[in-house]
Amino acid sequence: DFEGYHFRIVDLPGTYSLSAYTPEEIYVRRHIIDETPDVIINVVDSSNLERNLYLTTQLIDMNVRMVVALNIYDELEASGNTLDYHLLSKLFGVPMLPTVSKKNRGLDTLFHVVINLYEGVDFFDKQGNMNPEVLKDLTEWHDSLEDRKNHEEEHLEDYVREHKRTGRVFRHIHINHGPDLEKAIEAVKEEVSKNEFIRHKYSTRFLSIKLLENDPDIESFVRTLPNAEEILRIRDKMAKRVQDTMNEDC
């Protein structure tokens, strides 16, 4: 329990992607789709971002509500490396917070942001700026923490003050795969989107990307749709076009 909210947390198996290559990947993906969690806390290893952020891009394509916990942040600091997580948050368009779970560092902030996401707080406006009311709330909430016992001031100070100065972060952003792939994704997505009943549960962009990757699990699902034959025809056509243009498959 935190700030009057009761959290039901499901710890899913660790995975670096949402492909269909391992049982863990399939299980995690199906859980997200079938159980539709209110908010996803995407815990990444701060010292191995390149490997971890691929999963983040896939979660973005799934259109889930998400906050990224940059965990084991103390080890990154101890190594002498630095991370501009303010910029990283802007580039991905999702809140990213440094945490050290073993020391309870940053966890209060993390769950406060989770509550805001759950309540449907609009973190970003149409221009990609962070909502000033959200900034005000985070700043005031952080200031109230300074009087709490054993509060680690640095765990939010830098994050909130930085945003207070700049007042800008980018909105939830899908990774652009380049003109050829994006054209293929859009073509498949247009046909998939004709099935309005699936929109509340599936991201049509995510389904389209996975179809172009020949994901067997997603293809099996798509074959149950009324226009499955046309979807797969367009997928095959666009996949061939990408292969001919880029000399590699999707």
Task: Please provide the spans of the model-predicted regions.
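Conserved C-terminal guanine-recognition region of P-loop GTPase G domains, centered on the G4
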Residues: 1-7, 23-97
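Flexible beta-alpha connector loops of hexameric P-loop NTPases
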Residues: 13-22, 73
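Short, surface-exposed acidic/glycine-rich loop or hinge patches that mediate macromolecular interfaces
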Residues: 15, 46-49, 101-104
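Surface-exposed beta-strand edges and their flanking turn/coil or helix-capping segments
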Residues: 22-24, 111-112
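Alpha-helical transmembrane helix bundles of large polytopic membrane transport and channel proteins
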Residues: 67, 77-250
